[in-house]
Amino acid sequence: MVLTNSKQPRKQRKALYNAPLHLRNSVMSAMLAKELKEKYAKNSLPVKKGDTVKVLRGNFKGIEGEVSKVDYAGYKIIVEGVVNKKQDGNETAYPIHPSNVMITKLDESDEKRFKNSSN
């Protein structure tokens, strides 16, 4: 998906910030694990609710959990088990950018998701 044909970083950023929600899906892609790359002949796929991902970067590196929410407006995903502890003891979900995770298990309930893949 191309949001803009411009090479200028400022125009690319502006296109990213002003992109409609139905086009933000392809920007929210994460790399696939080795087995999934071989199975689907793709390097990355858009993250969906129900996928299992492993965090590769940041303070939560190494944690594996299921995606519980995809925030297209903020370009972030919420992963179960990735929580911030607040001062009063409560835990809040910590949003992560999809480029910092790897999909280890796909939610295969959506048949349309794989209709164009080789398998």
Swiss-Prot record:
It comes from the Archaea. Coiled coil: none annotated. GO terms for cellular component: large ribosomal subunit. CDD domains: KOW_RPL26 (cd06089). Pfam families: KOW (PF00467), Ribosomal_L26 (PF16906). One of its GO terms (biological process) is translation. InterPro entries: KOW (IPR005824), Rib_uL2_dom2 (IPR014722), Ribosomal_uL24_CS (IPR005825), Ribosomal_uL24_euk/arc (IPR005756), Ribosomal_uL24_KOW (IPR041988), Translation_prot_SH3-like_sf (IPR008991). SUPFAM superfamilies: Translation proteins SH3-like domain (SSF50104). PROSITE patterns: RIBOSOMAL_L24. Keywords: Ribonucleoprotein, Ribosomal protein, RNA-binding, rRNA-binding. GO terms for molecular function: rRNA binding; structural constituent of ribosome. Belongs to the universal ribosomal protein uL24 family. One of two assembly initiator proteins, it binds directly to the 5'-end of the 23S rRNA, where it nucleates assembly of the 50S subunit. Part of the 50S ribosomal subunit. This is Large ribosomal subunit protein uL24. It comes from Methanococcus maripaludis (strain DSM 14266 / JCM 13030 / NBRC 101832 / S2 / LL).
